[in-house]
Amino acid sequence: MEATISAEIFRDLTAVADEAGLLRFGAVRLDDPRLDHSRAAFEAFIAAGHQGEMQFLAHTKTMREDTNLLLPGAQSALVGVMAYAGESSAVARYAQWADYHTIVHRRLELVAKRVRDLLPGGETKICVDTKPIPERAFAMLAGIGFQGKNGCLIVPGLGSYVVIGTILTTGALAFDPASESRPRTSPPTARPWDACGSCRAWLDD
């Protein structure tokens, strides 16, 4: 019998995420056809050689396209974000912080444990910038934010100084994620950065 995540269960998970310190939380089906745009964009990026010396991007392309290679039977992605602080300097703000991989992973584990408690037989896989998944696309489709002109995920109310954490799960969403994910932003388009309007802060600052 397939494990399913109902709207009621998702609200329970959202409460756990809130208590764990995740400032935004949403969900997306892994078979959402809108993910095709992200996959096509990544294919074009690799084909053009834009990865430069980051050859691992090309080497993990197949895994990025098929999350079943990371978690067999994966049906959904639960996405959470945390904001980080720091001073403006030559060192990136996220690098001034404690290791976000560990911090976000620990908080996601609280949610993942709840998933496993509520879905007998359900499995989870936590990804915090260490697994080849389209986490930014997941976050956008989950209604958490949009892709800015700077290429980063921009979360209304938090900006782009956020880190994304994802829980892949074999639990299938039995509700419309758009009705439950909060706060909700507009669905991504082929030009998601249009939401930036005429803003050039990423270039001018």
Regions found by a protein language model. Give the residues of each.
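Iron-sulfur cluster-binding cysteine motifs and their immediate structural context
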Residues: 32, 195-205
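Auxiliary alpha/beta "docking" domains used to position bulky ligands
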Residues: 1-194
